[in-house]
Design a protein with these regions (language model features):
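S-adenosyl-L-methionine-dependent nucleic acid methyltransferase catalytic domains
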Residues: 1-325, 371, 396-399, 403-940
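N-terminal auxiliary segments of SAM/dcSAM-dependent transferases
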Residues: 303-416
Length: 940
């Protein structure tokens, strides 16, 4: 541990959970893409056979044509972009606090030293050949391809226990996505709010152009691949609104089979949708199993107390002296206290209509019962719920009461002070509470996902979310000790989710496989603690609270009741006989009055008191036996917590389908990301560059600020080899000429391409080169100028392919330049180093200058203080936006980490760090749109 708790101050220990028994395949980092074998880099093709024999089935336009062939999914490899260990960040703050207090900071272990856990003799570049430590995963990309890659390349087929799928509720593109980390205000019809992220727009273009028909195709394809990932006992939960719940349920039955349907759960929305008629306040969660006969299910319970709906039928009370009566209205309304020792109960059914069982005279469990001098038989259509021996024990335990013409079972409220949850979850509130703050435009309440995960999984099981959003599924899975993989097409969503996970605080639940857990289990179960050796294996689960569950069956099978009855009969029967003799009566047990008659002789009064005292004691002993023999229900949502410890998220990786998600540059010329695809092919059809030029003329080139836009006064084709357009814009009052270079529709622009285009532009007398491409190879990033000619690299968004779907208004930021970060490396007097982020260098077309934008446009920035050119480890993290992901941790650890250390998390200057052993550091800067740029420094 980084810091041991002080006995005097009661300091908290910061810890985390790891899944030591679980492994994952060794996959490439973005840095290793250049050494991939060709067969590893080449996308595979995965086929899922269609089921053409479905009857009945949901039909939509285009389904027949799709069913003519199998579902074919291209399976690209995944690349690790970042490795994150949140505990390492907290350990660094603890060390800084120690140093500020002039105490010797404890040497903290390097949590990244064995992050992978690869076998020592294994070649780290032999991808997909070795297993390594499990780390949770946050993946950028189309969920269809990502899930197929997990199944085919990484062997996760049949390994996922639970999938929580929250697809768009309908086909309105804008309302489902968020365009910036700084704003949740997304309006349909606002062109400025339409997301411009390539992965999302591709999903939109491919999905919604044919309305509900495309929507159903989108869902069916992903559900098909998702089913392939599930274990035989696995479950999928699909959250959907009332607009499409009927279609989606039919679609799930097509994919999983109607026999795999488990439940349709109704949940209350945070706000009602208005309409002409009734407002919609209900959303739905559809629960389907991979195999209905083997589904893993853990019951969850709600409370059942007097005054609640679940206890509405509990209308009677038995007092401590065994007298019974109805509850008063004030008692039922909780306006009056019950007498001490009183137990609330209801008169429940003691007969059964079991189908297929014989009933009537001579049938099993059909017999007369003598009670209070009467003989009661069940009707000819029913039978008792127990046999004759069981009925005698129920009578002996005072669990049977005579009603007007039959018998009833006495069911106490505390027999089972909980109630199994059903499919109506209207008790789940919204997500604007302090405990569950909203950070994303479409965000699911934590409690909703928590219930689903707890019902269908155990600690250590794997949970997958194909639609990450704000990361709620990952947050819940992390809290409850489940492994998780979350996927999204939005870089904004993943930026928010990453910050949320990095700064989250979780309770530390007692592991069953720990010494503290063994001690707690012994205490709760009232047994001697286990002496078995412990290993901290989370798959053994937690130590849970539990409630007794007394049933009619457990009482009927409790043979100890017979023994207790016989023992007390030896006391009660002589007293009854003496009482009858004194009063010259022949009372049976049930006829003895509760209160004595004042006219009785003193001897009879004492016998009466002794008899009732023994009778009450017998009842208490029988009740104690019933409670001791009762089964228990575990409360899986209430594990015992060790409040001396604080838990942060375990290690996780940030990954993507493409190795070119970030642009990496080295100030000293050394390169971070040597990823490169084959040479870009520029044999694009004339239609593609022509379409790009048309949009470029209308939209211009946007930088971080709205004012910093290159607005072209004219733009025409140019007959060059690489330069294909000539644009004119104003710099002050002077007109300038821009050469337009357009990269391939599919592929990556390399440095050599930019150099050649810049030379061509310089020879032709242009004032600036504007390169437009979907991806830039890492060598290009530090190439910003060739002689006098500035080179601007604009990233094109993939919605340029969808002119028919998104109107070209010129306001969509189709061509965006996220400039190179302006970073200073500082050296302190003690030889340690700091990094200062000044902002982002941007080209101002109005003046022709390159200026620093300042830090306002930066959402967060990370440092790998010992960059080994193999992986980017997030060793320092700083958040410059308005959100504070460490808010809850700051409150919990206010005694362990001082305010000055916390304040460093929001600065533009890093905390000091020693000279890296590798001789290099890497700095990654992320803006509010999710764009990432990385820069490498050689530290002498």
């Amino acid at each position: 541990m980084a810091r041991k708790p002080k006995a005097a101050t009661g300091g908290k220990t910061v810890t985390t959970l790891t899944h030591d028994e679980a492994k994952r395949r060794n996959i490439p980092t973005a840095e290793f893409v250049s050494v991939l074998e060709p067969e590893e880099e080449r996308p595979l093709e995965l086929r899922y056979p269609r089921n053409r024999d479905l009857d009945p089935q949901l039909v939509w336009r285009g389904k027949d044509e799709q069913d003519w062939s199998d579902l074919v999914v291209h399976v690209p490899p995944l690349y690790i972009q970042e490795k994150v260990h949140p505990k390492a960040l907290i350990d660094d703050l603890l060390r800084e606090t120690k140093e500020r207090a002039h105490e010797a900071g404890e040497v903290t272990p390097d949590l990244f030293a064995d992050f992978n856990g690869m076998p020592k003799d294994a070649d780290k570049t032999e991808f997909y050949q070795h297993d390594q430590n499990w780390t949770n995963r946050m993946i950028l990309g189309d969920s269809l391809q990502v899930m197929a890659s997990l199944a085919e390349r990484e062997g996760l087929r049949g390994k996922v226990q639970c999938i929580y799928f929250d697809p768009p509720y309908g086909i309105k593109f804008n309302s489902n996505f968020q365009w910036s980390t700084t704003s949740r205000d997304v309006k349909d019809g606002n062109a400025g709010h339409i997301t411009r992220e390539p992965e999302q727009v591709k999903a939109f273009r491919d999905t919604w152009r044919d309305g509900i028909h495309s929507y159903l195709t989108y869902l069916r394809d992903r559900l098909t691949v998702a089913r392939d990932l599930l274990t035989e006992s696995g479950s999928i939960f699909v959250q959907i609104g009332d607009e499409n719940v009927h279609r989606v349920r039919a679609l799930l039955e097509d994919v999983f089979g109607d026999e795999s349907f488990v439940a349709q759960i109704a949940t209350k929305t945070s706000g009602g949708s208005t309409g002409v008629y009734l407002s919609g306040v209900i959303d739905y969660v559809l629960w389907f199993a991979k195999n209905g006969e083997h589904t893993k299910y853990r019951s969850l319970f709600g409370t059942k107390g007097l005054g609640e709906d679940a206890a509405d039928k509990y209308s009677r009370v038995r007092l401590h002296n065994l007298e019974t009566r109805s509850l008063t209205p004030a008692e039922r309304a909780l306006e009056a206290d019950l007498p001490n020792g009183a137990r609330v109960y209801r008169q429940d059914n003691i007969t059964s209509q079991s189908v297929g069982r014989d009933k009537g005279e001579g049938a099993a469990s059909w017999f007369p019962v003598e009670i209070a001098g009467q003989e009661i038989r069940p009707s000819i259509k029913v039978r008792w719920k127990t046999n004759e021996l069981g009925m005698q024990r129920l009578l002996a335990a005072s669990r049977v009461e005579l009603t007007s013409n039959s018998l009833s079972y006495v069911r106490f409220l505390d027999d089972f002070s909980a109630t199994t949850i059903n499919n109506s979850w209207t008790d789940i509130g919204g997500i604007q509470s302090r405990a569950d703050p909203k950070v994303y435009v479409v965000q699911t309440p934590t409690t909703l996902i928590q219930r689903c995960i707890l019902m269908a999984t155990d600690p250590g099981d794997l949970v997958l979310d194909p639609t990450c959003g704000s990361g709620t599924t990952a947050t819940v899975a992390e809290q409850w000790g489940r492994r998780w993989i979350t996927i999204d097409t939005s870089r904004v969503a993943l930026a928010l989710a990453r910050a949320r996970i990095m700064g989250a605080r979780y309770p530390y639940y007692l592991l069953a496989d720990s010494r503290d857990g063994q001690m707690k289990e012994g205490e709760v179960a009232r047994t001697a603690p286990s002496s078995q050796p412990t290993h901290g294996n989370i798959r053994h689960g937690f130590v849970y609270e539990r409630v007794p569950h007394i049933t009619l069956k457990s009482i009927a099978n409790n043979a100890e009741i017979d023994v207790i009855w016989e023992q007390w009969q030896r006391t009660l029967e002589p007293l009854r006989e003496k009482l009858n003799a004194a009063l010259k009566t022949t009372w049976q047990e049930w006829e003895i009055p509760r209160e004595p008659d004042p006219k009785w002789p003193d001897g009879a009064t004492k016998l009466h008191a002794d008899w009732w005292q023994a009778r009450v004691r017998r009842q208490k002993e029988i009740d104690a036996s019933i409670a001791a023999k009762a089964e228990y229900e575990y409360l899986y949502d209430k594990p015992y917590e060790d409040r001396r410890r604080v838990r942060v998220a375990g290690p996780f990786t940030v990954e993507s389908l493409s190795p070119h998600r970030m642009l990496a540059v080295g100030e000293d010329g050394d390169l971070v990301d040597t990823a490169a695809e084959a040479s870009a092919q520029y044999a694009a059809t004339q239609a593609f560059p022509q379409m790009i030029l048309e949009n470029l003329k209308t939209a211009g080139v946007q930088q971080a600020h709205r004012d910093d836009r290159i607005a072209f006064t004219a733009l025409h084709p140019w007959p060059g080899d690489l330069v294909c357009g000539e644009g004119r814009y104003l710099e002050g009052d002077a007109e300038k000429r821009a050469a337009i270079f357009i990269g391939p529709e599919f592929g990556t622009v390399q440095r050599a391409d930019l150099v050649a285009a810049a030379r061509e532009a310089g020879d032709a007398g242009f004032d600036v080169l504007v390169a437009c491409a979907f991806n830039y190879e890492a060598h290009t990033t530090e190439f910003a100028k060739l002689g006098r000619l500035p080179v601007l690299k604009a990233r094109m968004n993939a919605d340029l392919h969808m002119a028919a779907d998104l109107k070209n208004t010129g306001k969509g930021n189709l061509f965006v330049i996220f400039g190179e970060p302006d970073i200073d490396l500082l050296t302190d007097s003690d030889g340690r180093h700091r990094v200062k982020v000044n902002g982002v260098d941007l080209f101002k077309p109005q003046t022709g200058e390159v200026v620093s934008d300042g830090a306002d446009g930066i959402a967060c920035w990370f440092i790998d203080t010992d960059y080994n050119e193999e992986s980017f480890f997030v060793r320092h993290a700083y958040f410059l936006g308005a959100n504070d992901p460490y808010g809850s941790l700051r409150t919990t650890l206010k005694a362990e980490i001082d305010p000055d250390a916390w304040a460093t998390l929001h600065g533009d200057t890093s905390r000091p760090f020693p000279k890296p052993r590798s001789g290099r550091i890497a700095v990654k800067v992320i803006n509010h749109l999710g764009d990432e740029v990385m820069k490498v420094f050689r530290v002498a």
